[in-house]
């Protein structure tokens, strides 16, 4: 009887442990996978401001390069690749939220012209699917299918991101024309320095909020520091809280000024934006161009043949 009760208790505890583990995994998995899109989507109706600045730069303060490659021209209702490259030194490690060091993630936002959108899976070729890998793209808004976001994803595997894009057909979409259109892209590597609510992350430099003498430095049990700065003139004290991650630059007894850096800047990532142009080409115009080129080539051929015929006539008259 006692063995049966013990077995039931162990079974109950194991079931509870597994359930809690699954819940924690689902919650953390969701928060990590949605972190980059949510930060931009929750705070901004449009990721590109009227000035042309992409809003991701509000949180990722360092400026880094990004590159985009698209075809010069595409035909209507055609799937093509938009390749976004986010280069960085793969040896770099960033400060994670818990203060430890880890690999960098990357993310991107692609702003297409109205009418262009993510290609449906059944229109994507096997070769393109292999280039895309396991990436999962999503629209910035349900009503903005022309704006796509991705990330954060592992930077070591996806520093080059292939977006499968479907071009619109003006025959079915009356608001689309055969024109040259701009495409805008923003790409980041690493964590941001500021959260959307304006608070700092632990991936940035921390400055003194007061001037005076560092009277006390307390190292917290879970990492980070509590720094007390005393004003020698009136004895007023300010306390600056440093989260885990940044390295401390000051020591007790040191005299510091207002806004003087208390830590280093641990950020190794950054954000960049770029643009490209693409032409939505009219098939009739292409056919007309091909017909024109063919007619020019035929005219040249007939001209050469006529010239040879004329030379033969001249040669025969001279011999006569």
Curated annotation (Swiss-Prot):
This is Cytochrome f. It is a single-pass membrane protein. Its cofactor is heme. GO terms for cellular component: chloroplast thylakoid membrane. GO terms for biological process: photosynthesis. Residues 1-35 form the signal peptide. Component of the cytochrome b6-f complex, which mediates electron transfer between photosystem II (PSII) and photosystem I (PSI), cyclic electron flow around PSI, and state transitions. It holds the Pfam family Apocytochr_F_C. It comes from the Eukaryota. One of its GO terms (molecular function) is electron transfer activity. Heme binds at residues 36, 56, 59-60. InterPro entries: Cyt-f_TM, Cyt_f, Cyt_f_lg_dom, Cyt_f_lg_dom_sf, Rudment_hybrid_motif. The gene is petA. The lineage of its organism: Eukaryota, Viridiplantae, Streptophyta, Embryophyta, Tracheophyta. It is found in: Plastid, Chloroplast thylakoid membrane. The keyword Transcription regulation does not apply. Binds 1 heme group covalently.
């Amino acid at each position: 009887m006692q063995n049966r009760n013990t077995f039931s208790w162990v079974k109950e505890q194991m079931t509870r442990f597994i359930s809690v583990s699954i819940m924690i995994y689902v919650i953390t998995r969701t928060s990590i996978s949605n972190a980059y899109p949510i930060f931009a989507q929750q705070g901004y109706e449009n990721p590109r401001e009227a000035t042309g600045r992409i809003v991701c730069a509000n949180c990722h303060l360092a400026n880094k390069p990004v590159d985009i490659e698209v075809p010069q021209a595409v035909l209507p209702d055609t799937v093509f690749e938009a390749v976004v490259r986010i280069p960085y030194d793969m040896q770099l490690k960033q400060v994670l939220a818990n203060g430890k060091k880890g690999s960098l993630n990357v993310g991107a936002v692609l702003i297409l012209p109205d009418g262009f959108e993510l290609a449906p899976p059944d229109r994507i070729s096997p070769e393109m699917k292999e280039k895309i890998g396991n990436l999962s793209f999503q629209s910035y808004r349900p009503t903005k299918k022309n704006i796509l976001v991705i990330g954060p994803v592992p930077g070591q595997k996806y520093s080059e991101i292939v977006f499968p894009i479907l071009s619109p057909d003006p025959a079915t979409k009356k608001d689309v024309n055969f024109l040259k259109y701009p495409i805008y892209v923003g790409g980041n590597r690493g964590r941001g320095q500021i959260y959307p609510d304006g608070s700092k992350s632990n991936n940035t430099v921390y400055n003194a909020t007061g001037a005076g003498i560092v009277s006390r430095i307390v190292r917290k049990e879970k990492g980070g520091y509590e720094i007390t700065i005393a004003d020698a003139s009136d004895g007023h004290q300010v306390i600056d809280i440093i989260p885990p991650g940044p390295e401390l630059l000051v020591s007790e007894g040191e005299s510091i000024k207002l806004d003087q850096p208390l830590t280093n800047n641990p950020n190794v990532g950054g954000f960049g934006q770029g643009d490209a142009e693409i032409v939505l080409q009219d098939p009739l115009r292409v056919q007309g161009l091909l017909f024109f080129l063919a007619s020019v080539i035929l005219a040249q051929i007939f001209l050469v043949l006529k010239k040879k015929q004329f030379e033969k006539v001249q040669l025969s008259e001279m011999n006569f």
